[in-house]
Amino acid sequence: VFGVIVGTGTGAGIIVGGRLHEGPNLIAGEWGHAPLPWPDDDERPGPPCYCGRRGCIETFLSGPGLSRSYEAAAGRFLQAHEVAELAAQGDDVAEACMARYERRMAKSLAMVISILDPEVIVLGGGVSNIKRLYDNVPRLWGEFAFSDQLSTKLVQAKHGDSSGVRGAAWLWPPSVAA
């Protein structure tokens, strides 16, 4: 399982055999600060990231990244979910931004598929509530993943954008909660 949080920022974790894989450097799954794979010419060097680099996946795929893309195209700011809603209503600019966002996500997840070959990719965070991602992104990632047979599934976290908070609550020591 490759679990992705896409909201204010982006992050991920890797589950192998039902256990979190941390890696020797404790950064396994640190996907948001990798560069956007297969960038188009106008995506280079990419927006500055708070980590000090440019063009990190997070700068493109976070909610603010989608909002920034829309603002650059339309000249006004909208939250990520508002861009998706406007696209669903037939707005051409919002639709173009969503299509580009989905292509960027497909590239980024195809890189993960080519390296980890997960059975499932789970999306959580606020952006995970954009339902069209679950049909459109898997249709696109085949162009970039190094396989002609892809069975990886893209699903929304069971508890949606509250999954991270629920997970943290499960990990909280009972003695502290009392």
Q: Model-predicted segments: where are they?
A:
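Histidine-centered active-site/metal-ligand motif
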Residues: 33
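Histidine-centered metal-chelating micro-motifs
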Residues: 10-11, 57
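Structural signature of FAD isoalloxazine-binding scaffolds in flavoprotein oxidoreductases
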Residues: 27-30
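Short glycine-aspartate micro-motif
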Residues: 1-5, 11-13, 48-50
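ATP-binding/phosphotransfer module of carbohydrate and carboxylate kinases, centering on a glycine-rich
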Residues: 20, 38-178
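Short beta-strand-to-turn element immediately C-terminal to the catalytic PLP-Schiff-base lysine
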Residues: 13-17, 21-23, 36-37
